[in-house]
Structures are given as C-alpha cells and as structure tokens.
Amino acid sequence: CQRLELRPMSEGAMTNLLVEEHTLSEDQAGLLARLSAGRLGWALRAIRDETILEERTSELEHLQEVVDGGLELQFKYAQQLTARFRKNFEAVLALLELWIKWWRDVLVLQEGSPEAVMNIDYRDVLEQMAHQFDSNEVIDLVRELIETQKRLRENANPRLALEVLMLAIPRKVKTA
C-alpha cells in the first residue's frame, strides 16, 4: 500500500474543464473552481447535486442575519445549532468551516487582496463587511471559530461552546 499525494487542480484549469466538459458558464465554472479549492471531485458533486450550493447560500444568509441580529437572535441560533449538532455533528463542523472561510474573506479584503476571496459570489457583501468591522475582532472571531470546532470534536457541551462563539461575533464599528 502506497500513499499517493495529489495536488489541487489549478483554478484556471478547473474552470476550463468545467466550461468545456460540463457546459457551465464561465461565471458558474469560476465560482465552483474557487469554492472547490482545487478539488475536482467537490466541484463535480456540486454540479450533480444542486442542494450543495443551495445549502451554502442558505447558511451564508443565516450567517448575515446572525451577524446583524442582537444577542437574543444569536443565542437562539446557538440553540438551533445545538439541536442540529446532536443530530448531525459533521454538518455543524462543516458550517463552522464555512464561517471560517467567510471571515477569512473579510480579512483578505481588509488587507487589500481581493483576488484571494473565495466567496466571489458574495464579493459586494464581503467588501461592505470589511469596512464595517475591526480587523482585530475578526481575527479573534476566526480563532474562536477554530477553537469551537476543536471543543466540539473534544466532546465539550455543544450549547455552551456555541453560545461562547456567538459572544465572539464582532459588533459593527463603522457603517458602510
């Protein structure tokens, strides 16, 4: 048995392949290539199963609502995530990973590297958020997201871990 290391496919090569072989528009192919981070299998699953991108859209809309909402909404969301966690541990960890990528994009824009944004279909919203939040608080939130994933994997109380996470969501410091 030999371990085989595979490198991610380049974004340009994947975009071309998806346009030519799967008749996607350039924009659709570019989005899938960016979101897949070079994993062709993920991009092909997203083409076959439309719910993958639909669920992502729904989760990102929830994220924006939670960020804009107050503590009451955030704690209610933590309660919903706790119930979901008890049914599907991996789905909540994947959601936290999506949040990490989202806030990473906010940081990338704050640092002036728009070409590195992963969620290119939400570029306008991300740019707005990059101007509304303090970068140190965003960094702290990303750290807390990573810690929350770790705590949940280590069997911490999910409700407590998720409520602590909600407290780490930064407050807007500027209006767009």
What label would you give each PLM region?
Residues 2-98, 103, 109-118, 122-176:
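Charged, glycine-rich active-site and insertion segments that engage polyanionic ligands
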